[in-house]
UniProtKB/Swiss-Prot annotation:
Pfam family name, one: Proteasome
Spans through the membrane: none
Function as written in the Swiss-Prot or TrEMBL entry: Protease subunit of a proteasome-like degradation complex believed to be a general protein degrading machinery.
Cellular component GO terms, alphabetical: HslUV protease complex; proteasome core complex
The name this protein goes by in its record: ATP-dependent protease subunit HslV
Presence of the UniProt keyword Protease in the record: yes
Keywords: Allosteric enzyme, Cytoplasm, Hydrolase, Metal-binding, Protease, Sodium, Threonine protease
Length: 178
């Protein structure tokens, strides 16, 4: 079976508001097989937003693990992310999962990968997936050169990514927290 390709996830924080968006396209080989996939979830009673790129089943499994860590560490996102990254890197089952995640709360924005990475960006703009570089570039330009709020930056940058990346569409799921 051909590999499923997708997606674009973008996170921006400005003026106390964190916004994460994901597009809805899932591509299998040269065909779009779904237009309305939901790759963004809200965890920890609405205090954490997570988006994933890669295998849907793997991304959902990792979100469940992150939620368990958030419960264990009383909502501390950084501690939970570090512990998940350790497990992801060391556990024989988890190591095979093919997904990358962005997790954010009102104060933190983190990229988590199966390599054990937990990366906080220098600026509060972070993106993953096939259209991630396009979305991040557009978002950084808007963040640095306009007074647009986080949601508007995300909306505009995702539109640009969707115009450039063939694995990204214009059906966005957007979540925000303050």
């Amino acid at each position: 079976m051909e590999k499923i390709k997708s997606t674009t996830i973008l996170a921006v924080r400005r003026n106390g508001k964190t916004v994460i968006a994901g597009d809805g396209q899932v591509t299998l080989g040269s065909a779009v097989v779904k237009h309305t996939a939901k790759k963004i979830r809200v965890l920890n009673e609405g205090k954490v937003i997570v988006g994933f790129a890669g295998s849907a089943a793997d991304g959902l499994a990792l979100m469940e693990r992150l939620e368990e860590k958030l419960n264990k560490y009383k909502g501390n996102l950084v501690k939970s992310a570090v512990e998940l990254a350790k497990d992801w890197r060391l556990d024989k089952y988890l190591r095979r999962l093919e997904a990358v995640m962005i997790a954010a709360d009102k104060n933190n924005m983190l990229l988590l990968s199966g390599n054990g990475d937990v990366i906080e960006p220098d600026e509060p703009v972070l993106a993953i997936g096939s259209g991630g570089d396009y979305a991040r570039s557009a978002a950084l330009a808007l963040y640095r050169n306009t007074d647009l709020d986080a949601r508007k930056i995300v909306e505009e940058a995702m539109k640009i990514a969707g115009e450039i990346c063939i694995y990204t569409n214009q059906n966005f799921v957007i979540e925000e927290i303050e």
